Design a protein with these regions (language model features):
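Glycine-rich phosphate/pyrophosphate-handling loop used in enzymes and phosphotransfer proteins
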Residues: 1-178, 182-210
């Protein structure tokens, strides 16, 4: 046990998916697992979309779905930097004028129960990678029921008015970060609140699309 702890301290990290040592320092996903991840295209959003760009590099399939659930519901926080690493690789698909990051907020009760906000844990390393600030004062003011199992109409109704921004936003182009996009109801409602607070343009970067 002591020898393995020493090895882990001086050797590269272990892959979060298979446990093998990664060959590159600070890499959380080995080359083999990275090649096997269910990647999908991120086409330009339709003209009716409120977003400048919407990027989700992975499909919500195994092993991505299992890893996201483990992060959120089993407190497997080691997945967060791995997802951030994958999002940093996808940042080349984003516009180059983004000037601040907004992780999707949790209601305070859910965050207290969970102990963390998964979007914030993923968003912090991405913000550091891009050299951008995290926007403060963005709040989920209503404890909405879980979105799981709801159709698109019910998801939108469930989230109506859920977000508020408690300060004027001076940044012109914001990047919302989330773990999964399903119908897009969450990020659209957050986008609406950000625009009311002064944002001119909003893009979205999520780990996966369901």
């Amino acid at each position: 046990m002591l020898l393995r702890a020493f090895d882990d301290a001086v050797m590269p990290l272990r892959c979060v998916f298979c446990g093998a040592r990664t060959r590159e320092p600070e890499k959380h996903v080995c080359a083999g697992c990275d090649a096997d991840l269910p990647r999908i295209a991120s086409p330009p959003p339709p003209a009716s979309s409120p977003f400048e760009t919407e990027v989700a590099p992975l499909a919500y399939e195994f092993p991505v779905d299992a890893a996201i659930k483990a992060l959120k519901f089993q407190r497997k926080l080691f997945y967060a930097p791995a997802f951030a690493e994958l999002l940093c690789d996808a940042c080349a698909l984003l516009p180059n004028d983004i000037d601040a990051i907004v992780p999707v907020p949790l209601h305070w009760r859910r965050r207290w129960f969970r102990g963390f906000n998964q979007a914030h844990e993923i968003g912090k390393p991405v913000a550091r990678y891009l050299g951008l600030p995290l926007v403060r004062g963005v709040v989920r003011r209503r404890a909405t029921p879980s979105q799981s199992g709801l159709n698109a109409h019910d998801r939108a109704r469930n989230l109506r008015g859920a977000f508020v921004v408690r300060r004027t936003i001076s940044h012109r182009h914001l990047l919302i970060i989330d773990d999964v996009i399903t119908t897009g109801a969450t990020v659209r409602q957050l986008c609406r609140a950000l625009r009311v607070a002064g944002a001119e343009r909003v893009s979205v970067l999520a780990v996966a699309r369901a």
